[in-house]
């Protein structure tokens, strides 16, 4: 199902998620989840195509402790750059469909990363002692004008939320609100929208 243009040596980049996605649209309301490789380490250099490599030199091994801190950071920053590019492709894809569908994209990472600070790498420390950079994650929202209109969302109000702190507990309840799903399990106070 994936194009070889987005794969190299058995490793597929996140863009492969968009290959043939249009063929899966049914014409009905759909909820699509794209689960990326994103910036998951330790093999950061395998998460983006060579064309996205702008920060050099990079760590080319999954043994991060064998690389300089700057090489690890450069490889990780290239993954962030590629994720930004990938999200722009998702938005482009959604934009071409907004005349037929109300489209929305929500991007959230499952965790942050340690890149060698205090000799810590990757993620997964117990929450109570995990450094902030393992707990802070991006949360990006984009929606078509039709979605804003039909859900009566106010862009200015959403922009004002950018400095508030939320956590993953908000995601489930926010999706219920966004998609106008009513259930006794919903907790409207956790819906950020």
Segments (PLM) and residue ranges:
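Catalytic domains that recognize anionic headgroups
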Residues: 1-193
